[in-house]
Structure formats: structure tokens, C-alpha cells
């Protein structure tokens, strides 16, 4: 291994047979592939190295070190190996070799929507518990995901195991919170402080996304589906009420704060009608305006909503 923990190895193309392209992440293509030596099916994430870059991009190195650190948790997709290869132009490419998981939450939700069925409540509960558990592990190790969405929550349909993937934008955060760049998260799952231009944020950005995913599992529709940053904010305000200094101290000082239409909060049950009382209570704690007041992943696991989940320790 060299200093970066990247193994110069058999070229990835000699070691693997690409079966199909399964996606395109922010930093490169993802293939389903077979390891020739063992026959094992894996996910190969090919990371592009930009023309002007000497060596491996820092985003990739960061992802590798974070994933190696987090690989112990069953709810984080496992990074099994890193291989270097050379592409047709003679440029270095990196292949991250991940365990292969057969579907994701976006496809899972879509299959129920298309069938006109609800996802069974105990399934929602089981998936949410695993998501909270995986995020508690990330946050406990000082890692924010910052791009949680159904598409990067992988799922094994047979075992109903959920695994958090695509920690590409994650960066280890240490207290005090550093200033962060803005280019994160799909709009629908983006926390209001990010939409309003906050430069210091914390685990609350992930917990907001977890809340949005919770609501979507129950209704099969995104709870806040905006097509611009402004529309996204207005959708949130229409349901939760327009925030003010009383409910969210400091909100009017945020960079992108303006005077917005004044909406009164509606009951969450209007947006998520078939969620029980304990579920609505947990959801309201995840969608709390003031980031520091948002429930933590660890606390969420102890919420009464999960009380009747059988055998939590096996999840």
C-alpha cells in the first residue's frame, strides 16, 4: 500500500469483468462487476481524475479514508478494496470496490407506488431504525453524510437490510464546526439552514434528510418537492409555518434570509395522514426548525415509535 491506503494492484480491468453500468455518482460511474478470481459480484465505482490533477483527487482520498473507518458498521456499504487502473487515454483511474447490494430505497418506494400499495408499517419502522442506527454510527465517528436521499440508501430485498452509500460528499467534522461549501444535497432533502445559506452546520442537516425520507416511506411521495431553492423553502414554510426568531433564534441573520409570506404551521398529519401518533411525534422532532433542537440519530433510536420493533439488536 502507498501512503494513501490505495493499493497498486492488478489493473482493475484484469481483475474484474464489468457486467452492467448501474449508475453515475457525482464523481464517477458505478458498475456491477464480477471478480474473476472468486466469481463474487461487486459494485465498482470508477472515479474520474481531472486532467489537471496530479494523482488522486482529495475528494476520493477523503471518501476512502472515511469509508475504511466506517466499514465496520453493517448499515454502511462496505468498501472492500481500492484498485488503480489506466484508461484508454493512459490516465490513472481509481476503482473503489464495494459490496454489491441489489436495490435502493428510491426503487423500493417506486415499486409500491406503481403497485398502488402502501409500504407495511413494520417495514417502514424496520428501515427507519436501521437508517437511524447507521447515521448514529456515522455521527458518533464525527462524519456527516450531507447527501442522504432514497437513491443512496441501498437495500437487500431478501434480508431487508439497509445500507448507507455514497459518502462522497461526507467530510469528517470536528468541533467547532468548520465553514462548509454550499454544493451539497439534492434539494428535496435539504435542510432549511442550508437553503438559507448557513455556513456552519452539524448533524442536524442529516437528521432533516432522515425526516424527509421517513415521510416519503409512509406516503410514497417526497414531502417537500421543490424545483428551486426558493420553491423548496416555500414548500417547507407552507407546512411547518414560516419560521421566525421565536421558533428559530438567529434565522433572520442567515445570509439568504428575506421577508417571506407568513404561513401558520399545519399539523404534520395533513401531509403524512397514515402515520400513527408516535411516528408523527418522531417526525416532528426530525423536522424541527432549530438545527440544535433536532433529535439526534442516537436519541431517535430510543423513541417510543420503535418500542414494538421486535429484536432490535439483530438489526
UniProtKB/Swiss-Prot annotation:
GO CC annotations on file: cytosol
Record-annotated active site: 147
UniProt-listed SMART domains: S_TKc
Keyword Kinase included in the entry's annotation: yes
Record-listed Phosphothreonine modification sites: 181
Keywords: ATP-binding, Kinase, Nucleotide-binding, Phosphoprotein, Serine/threonine-protein kinase, Transferase
GO terms of biological process kind: hormone-mediated signaling pathway; protein autophosphorylation; regulation of G2/M transition of mitotic cell cycle; regulation of meristem structural organization; regulation of mitotic cell cycle
Name of the featured protein: Cyclin-dependent kinase B2-2
Originating organism: Arabidopsis thaliana (Mouse-ear cress)
Gene: CDKB2-2
Amino acid at each position: 500500500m502507498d501512503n494513501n491506503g490505495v493499493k497498486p494492484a492488478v489493473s482493475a480491468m484484469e481483475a474484474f469483468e464489468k457486467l452492467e453500468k448501474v449508475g453515475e455518482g457525482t464523481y464517477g460511474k458505478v458498475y456491477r462487476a464480477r471478480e474473476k478470481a472468486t466469481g463474487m459480484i461487486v459494485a465498482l465505482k470508477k472515479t474520474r481524475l481531472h486532467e489537471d490533477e496530479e494523482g488522486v483527487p482529495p475528494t476520493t482520498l477523503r471518501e476512502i479514508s472515511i469509508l475504511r473507518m466506517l466499514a465496520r458498521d453493517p448499515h454502511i456499504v462496505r468498501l472492500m478494496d481500492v484498485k488503480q487502473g489506466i484508461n484508454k487515454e493512459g490516465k490513472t483511474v481509481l476503482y473503489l470496490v464495494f459490496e454489491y447490494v441489489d436495490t435502493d430505497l428510491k426503487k423500493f418506494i417506486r415499486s409500491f407506488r406503481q403497485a398502488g400499495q402502501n409500504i407495511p408499517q413494520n417495514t417502514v419502522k424496520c428501515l427507519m431504525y436501521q437508517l437511524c442506527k447507521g447515521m448514529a454510527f456515522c455521527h458518533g465517528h464525527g462524519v456527516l453524510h450531507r447527501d442522504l436521499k432514497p437513491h443512496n440508501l441501498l437495500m437487500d430485498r431478501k434480508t431487508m437490510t439497509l445500507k448507507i452509500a455514497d459518502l462522497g460528499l461526507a467530510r469528517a467534522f470536528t468541533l467547532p464546526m468548520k465553514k462548509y461549501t454550499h454544493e451539497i444535497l439534492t434539494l428535496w432533502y435539504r435542510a432549511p439552514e442550508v437553503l438559507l445559506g448557513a455556513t456552519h452546520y452539524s448533524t442536524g442537516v442529516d437528521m432533516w434528510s432522515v425526516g424527509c425520507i421517513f415521510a416519503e416511506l409512509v406516503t410514497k411521495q417526497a414531502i417537500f418537492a421543490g424545483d428551486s431553492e426558493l420553491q423548496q423553502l416555500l414548500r417547507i414554510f407552507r407546512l411547518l409555518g414560516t419560521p421566525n426568531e421565536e421558533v428559530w433564534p438567529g434565522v433572520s441573520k442567515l445570509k439568504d434570509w428575506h421577508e417571506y409570506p407568513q404561513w401558520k404551521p399545519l399539523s404534520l398529519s395533513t401531509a403524512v395522514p397514515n402515520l400513527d401518533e408516535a411516528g408523527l411525534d418522531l417526525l416532528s422532532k426530525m423536522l424541527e426548525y432549530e438545527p440544535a433542537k433536532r433529535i439526534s440519530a442516537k436519541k431517535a433510536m430510543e423513541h417510543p415509535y420503535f418500542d414494538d420493533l421486535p429484536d432490535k439488536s439483530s438489526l
